[in-house]
């Protein structure tokens, strides 16, 4: 009887899981924006709850993010098969990486078992590239990029709230301070580096203009054209005021990034700032003015910091910065681990195609066996996908950087996102939510190409609500014109005070 009860519970759980999967698959198919919100929301929930709770055992513990990634891959594959047209070069590179990942998982399952292979590939490969592929193949509808950016900013606001709540609970401490609560050592930073990176990228999305060189941006980013008789100056003024309103939340995001003390994210912000400055047009001294303003701000901050006006916050940040120069710093620990991983025996096939997922990352660092991932995505890809996978990944990002900077589709914010990923990969493997931004870069290139082509996309980049408003406006104009045509012209056309009557003339 006990075995029957267990079997009944497993059957019910399986049916519930299949029903949930069917609902999610319908959402991913019919409601792309909601699906992107789920991909971002599950990561916020995982950080707020301290991790995801498995809800099904299928040979390995199935997490909610795994289920969402499976839906994303299935729907993206169906889109590619239904479209029938050959995808663009950058999308082909992404598909090549996904195929290499699937093949490595299959090899790892046969050698080390499904659990080991799935746990090795699930976060930094499966979930990351699944999100990227889903967003990259999303239908070309007007406002898609704007919705994705807004969802990204909502997740950043959630991380900001979690950071503030953590500081209220435990206070602000330096990374070098080993704090304990209830006898357990905890990280003094309230949220991990992935959350700080989302905040930094949100500042970029808020501050950078969304559009291409020469003003020929995609329809999703094209400003509304001014109709005849419209107040263009007033509308441009509203746009300028909206840009100014974005400065304050962007600065708040950057302040939180500094206080969170994730030094890798600090480096990412610095590199993005330098690259962003290099992309500023050199005409009219704009680049020189930006450099002068940045130098002046840096000098002021340095003087205030040296004078001790930041108080305890300044000492906390100074301790975190000095830790990077110590011989026992976390970066030095990572470098030692990288060297040990590269010393392992490798055959020619392993160098070219990598070892299968589940092989492990055991290495000796400081007399201790370390088994966590390499903390370097370039090395991570080399170990699992080989030189072929690493070159494919680099080609994908270099092609994105080049094409996002071309005439007609240059998007400074997305180019800086590409830069942030390339710097992040030095110290971390990519987090699942970063796949949404990678997919957005690919989607934006598709949208720009559709705008430039004569035939346009299969689904036009036109807001349907705007089309309906234009249709109703045309109907009203037609009705009014017909009524005026039937009215007798009895008013004085030369009199400025005369107005036509909207009421039809009464017949005697």
Please place each PLM-identified region on the residue numbering.
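N-terminal signal-anchor transmembrane segment
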Residues: 1-80, 101-107, 421
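Alpha-helical transmembrane segments of multi-pass inner-membrane proteins
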Residues: 23, 130-131, 146-174, 188-280
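Interfacial loop-to-transmembrane-helix boundary motif in multi-pass membrane proteins
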Residues: 32-39, 85-100, 134-164, 223
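Aromatic-anchored transmembrane helix interface
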Residues: 62-72, 90-105, 113-137, 147
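Transmembrane alpha-helices of multi-pass inner-membrane enzymes
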Residues: 204-205, 413-425, 430-471, 477-480, ...
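Hydrophobic transmembrane alpha-helices and their immediate junctions
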Residues: 223-228, 236, 383-421, 447-448, ...
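A membrane-periplasm/extracellular boundary helix in multi-pass inner-membrane enzymes
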Residues: 277-325, 344-347, 506-507
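Long extracytoplasmic/lumenal interhelical loops at the membrane interface
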Residues: 321-385, 404
């Amino acid at each position: 009887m006990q075995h029957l009860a267990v079997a009944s519970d497993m059957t019910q759980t399986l049916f519930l899981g299949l029903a949930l999967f069917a609902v999610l698959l319908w959402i991913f198919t019919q409601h792309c924006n909601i699906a992107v919100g789920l991909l971002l929301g599950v990561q916020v929930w995982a950080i707020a709850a301290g991790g995801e709770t498995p809800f099904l055992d299928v040979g390995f513990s199935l997490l909610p993010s795994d289920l969402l990634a499976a839906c994303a891959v299935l729907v993206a594959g169906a889109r590619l098969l239904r479209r029938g047209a050959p995808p663009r070069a950058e999308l082909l590179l992404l598909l090549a990486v996904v195929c290499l990942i699937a093949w490595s998982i299959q090899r790892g399952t046969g050698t080390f078992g499904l659990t080991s292979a799935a746990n090795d590939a699930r976060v930094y490969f499966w979930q990351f590239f699944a999100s990227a592929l889903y967003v990259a193949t999303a239908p070309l509808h007007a406002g898609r990029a704007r919705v994705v950016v807004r969802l990204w900013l909502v997740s950043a606001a959630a991380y900001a709230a979690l950071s503030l709540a953590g500081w209220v609970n435990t206070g602000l401490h330096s990374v070098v301070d080993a704090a304990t609560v209830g006898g357990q050592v905890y990280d003094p930073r309230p949220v991990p580096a992935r959350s700080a990176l989302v905040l930094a990228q949100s500042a970029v999305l808020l501050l950078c203009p969304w559009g291409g060189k020469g003003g020929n941006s995609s329809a999703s980013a094209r400003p509304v054209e001014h109709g005849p008789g419209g107040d263009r100056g007033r509308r441009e003024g509203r746009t300028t005021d909206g840009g100014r309103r974005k400065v304050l939340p962007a600065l708040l995001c950057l302040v939180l990034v500094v206080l969170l003390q994730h030094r890798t994210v600090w480096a990412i912000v610095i590199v993005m700032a330098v690259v962003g400055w290099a992309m500023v047009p050199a005409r009219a001294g704009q680049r020189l003015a930006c450099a002068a303003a940045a130098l002046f701000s840096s000098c002021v901050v340095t003087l205030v910091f040296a004078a001790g006006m930041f108080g305890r916050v300044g000492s906390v940040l100074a301790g975190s910065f000095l830790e990077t120069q110590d011989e026992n710093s976390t970066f030095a620990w990572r470098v030692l681990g990288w060297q040990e991983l590269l010393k392992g025996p490798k055959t020619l096939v392993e160098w070219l195609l990598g070892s299968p997922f589940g092989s492990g990352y055991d290495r000796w660092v400081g007399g201790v066996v370390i088994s966590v991932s390499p903390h370097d995505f370039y090395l991570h890809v080399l170990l699992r996908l080989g030189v072929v996978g690493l070159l494919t990944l680099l080609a994908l990002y270099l092609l994105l950087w080049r094409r996002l900077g071309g005439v007609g589709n240059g998007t400074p914010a997305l180019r800086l996102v590409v830069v942030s990923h390339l710097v992040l990969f030095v110290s971390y493997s990519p987090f699942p939510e970063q796949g949404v931004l990678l997919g957005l870069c690919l989607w934006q290139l598709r949208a720009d190409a559709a705008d430039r082509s004569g035939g346009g996309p299969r689904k036009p980049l036109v807001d349907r609500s705007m089309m309906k408003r234009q249709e109703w406006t045309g109907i009203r104009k037609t009705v009014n014109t017909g009524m005026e045509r039937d009215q007798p012209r009895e008013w004085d056309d030369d009199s400025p005070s005369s107005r036509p009557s909207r009421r039809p003339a009464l017949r005697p």
